[in-house]
């Protein structure tokens, strides 16, 4: 039986999660992309806690005027996530693309986080 698009993405994400494990010294940067928003969080899998989280839903009011599901919004979220993680002392992470291709909004978020000082 053929899988639909959502089932295929979940299957890919499970396959990637078998290989990608976040630790206390190098937590996991998990990205989820929906049709309207993009969400990113840094997770320590050994303790099972979220250390830092941000999304396009909770951007500042001055930035929320231009919230559209595009690469510019993803860059703002990536930069904001990197700034928050630097305050927490997190510099190196393992990137988990959530079963999506490393292209478009996912790539824009990752590149913005790298430019802001995070290491993958």
From Swiss-Prot:
Pfam families assigned to the protein according to its UniProt record, in alphabetical order: Ribosomal_L18p
Keyword set, alphabetical order: Chloroplast, Plastid, Ribonucleoprotein, Ribosomal protein, RNA-binding, rRNA-binding
CDD domains: Ribosomal_L18_L5e
Biological processes per GO annotation: translation
Molecular function per GO: 5S rRNA binding; structural constituent of ribosome
One GO cellular component term noted in the UniProt record for this chain: chloroplast
Xref: InterPro entries: Ribosomal_uL18_bac-type, Ribosomal_uL18_bac/euk
Subcellular location: Plastid, Chloroplast
Subunit description: Part of the 50S ribosomal subunit; contacts the 5S rRNA.
Function of the protein: Binds 5S rRNA, forms part of the central protuberance of the 50S subunit.
HAMAP family, A to Z: Ribosomal_uL18_B (MF_01337_B)
UniProt family annotation: Belongs to the universal ribosomal protein uL18 family.
Protein name (record): Large ribosomal subunit protein uL18c
Organism: Pyropia yezoensis
Gene assigned in the entry: rpl18
